[in-house]
């Protein structure tokens, strides 16, 4: 898949019909030796549709539109991970330990928040990394976002969740004691770490 002028995705495929019939902003350019070239508008909707068709290596518009926030410049594999995460409603990230998965997730969530697709993120993780990994990394990579760690008594956790931080980290054991608050908390993105 090739990006042309930051506007168009050029796809080479043996069967252009599924793309042309499902993606309105697409056009068949040519067919030669059984391979068709299809031009597709490079928007989030179109990229998600291509990803849903299992097209390989679909780039998300995050690569073009996002100003990578924070104190560190992302590596290409972090950009690729964030791109992948923005294209799928549900996704697993099995990158190796120490490759910057947390930063990639933060950037993907921040981008979706800037697009108005996500308003609050619930992070389920072990107690040992709620602060050291999530709160600290949120400050490092998206210091403009609010983050709270929901820990303590049930009353304290409920108060923290109701306070409205954009990112809330809670440990797995803490879920049961504030289930109602979480269900009613307006979380539209959930990260399980």
Question: Where on the chain are the PLM-derived regions?
Answer:
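N-terminal accessory interaction module
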Residues: 1-52
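SF2 helicase/translocase NTPase motor core
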Residues: 16-24, 30-31, 45, 55-83, ...
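The Walker A (P-loop) glycine that initiates the GxxxxGKT/S ATP-binding motif of P-loop NTPases
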Residues: 95
